[in-house]
Regions:
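Internal hydrophobic alpha-helix adjacent to the cofactor/substrate pocket in enzyme cavities
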Residues: 189-192
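Glycine-rich phosphate-binding loop signature in dinucleotide/nucleotide-binding domains
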Residues: 13-14, 25, 34-40
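A conserved short coil-to-beta-strand element within the FAD-binding core of flavoproteins
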Residues: 15-29
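Active-site acidic short loop of glycosyltransferases
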Residues: 40-42, 164-165
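Conserved FAD-binding catalytic core of PHBH/FMO-like flavoproteins
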Residues: 30, 37, 44-149
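FAD/FMN-dependent oxidoreductases across multiple families
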Residues: 118-187
Length: 192
């Protein structure tokens, strides 16, 4: 939200469309969007995530490492105050992180092997909360799931080339890592 608000204070134009094709031209790229709009640019920056369409269309190869784990994510609310403190616990079979969004709301990232993750994602919200309260040692009072619960596979990806003539990949389009260290966003900011 903050990034979109910052964008509105600049001369940058936000176009809600997906990348259909790119074509290298003498001094940059010609880009075609799925709304049939064509754009020409001198520098194409792919900042479009781990499954980067820019990287794919540019033909940039990448390596992958499958961690055989999933990240389970959701938002929760609590009866206690998170006190603006991020909290992480390393369990024998998983890692749970609590990332405050406000005094009483937080985002959960629970990294677990595929088998445990499938078990957790199949639980009712009530049973999921019980497991989460145990995993967080009941530090945050009574928890309640405040969003849908999602999961996604944890796969490290690294582009063979981050830069080509008139093109650069940044953030997860260039490299993404396990969320354990919480450094993905920092790496992306460093790229920019």
């Amino acid at each position: 939200k903050a990034l979109y608000e910052s964008l509105s204070r600049t001369s940058a134009e936000y176009i809600k469309a997906k990348l259909s094709s790119i074509k290298k031209i003498n001094n940059g790229y010609q880009i075609r969007l799925d709304n049939d709009e064509n754009i020409t640019c001198q520098l194409l920056i792919g900042a479009d995530g781990a499954l980067s369409r820019t990287r794919e269309l540019a033909g940039i190869e990448f390596s992958t490492t499958n961690y055989n784990q999933q990240a389970i994510i959701c938002n929760i609310t609590t009866t206690n105050d998170f006190e603006d403190t991020t909290w992480q616990r390393f369990l024998s079979d998983s890692i749970v992180a609590v990332l405050p969004l406000s005094n009483t709301q937080a985002s959960i990232v629970w990294s677990a092997n595929n088998h445990l993750a499938e078990d957790l994602i199949s639980l009712s919200n009530e049973d999921f909360v019980k497991r989460l309260e145990n995993a967080t040692e009941h530090r945050f009072g009574r928890l309640k799931v405040a969003s849908d619960i999602y999961s996604f596979p944890l796969i490290e990806r690294s582009a063979k080339d981050y830069v080509k003539e008139n093109l650069a990949l940044v953030g997860d389009a260039a490299h993404n890592i396990h969320p354990l260290a919480g450094q993905g966003a920092n790496l992306g900011f460093s790229d920019a």
